[in-house]
Amino acid sequence: MRLNPAKCTFAVEAGKFLGFMLTQRVIEANPDKCQAILNMKSPTCIKEVQQLNGRLAALSRFLAGAAIKSLPFYATLRKGKQFEWTTECEQAFQDFKEFLGRPPILSRPQEREPLILYLAVGSRAIASALVREDENVQQPVYFISKALQGSELNYQKIEKFSYTLILTSR
């Protein structure tokens, strides 16, 4: 294996790694990726909505319930439907921009530390949040969310909870 010395850093306190900002204690969203969304104007075509969804997917581990909040965007992508950027889409877009104005921070769990798992199940999306408790303050470790599609929409509530657990455990 050959390493490129220009791309290597050793014994650093913090830095960018695989698109994330890592420190000894926390993982932060890459400010460049957050800024890309903050600089976006409201989408005017399907291609721009797809681009927005891709950028949000890259930050999804930092966004609680990202799929649930993105449902208005998915509605604009339905085949056979004329593109329409609704007020609901605009509100969701502005909410994401407001949230990303303060880059999200995830806590790093300690070895053998108990973690808390929260599950959320809706009619069209599911989500989970893994958190740790530090001095009676809950700090997020990881977020997962998924928009349900096809036959998944017909699952019973208990099946959706089971599916959320399976998705989270992967």
Predicted regions and their residues:
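C-terminal reverse transcriptase regions that engage the nucleic-acid substrate
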Residues: 1, 6-113
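Secondary-structure transition/capping motifs at alpha-helix termini
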Residues: 1-2, 132-139
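Conserved catalytic motifs of the protein kinase core domain
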Residues: 17, 114, 125, 139-140
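Short, flexible loop/turn elements at secondary-structure junctions
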Residues: 44, 100, 121-123, 147
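Feature representing long, continuous alpha-helical segments
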Residues: 94, 126, 162-166
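Two-metal-ion RNase H-like nuclease active-site motif
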Residues: 113-121, 165
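Acidic, metal-ligating active-site segments
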Residues: 122-132
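A short, polar/acidic, helix/strand-boundary loop motif
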Residues: 136-163, 167
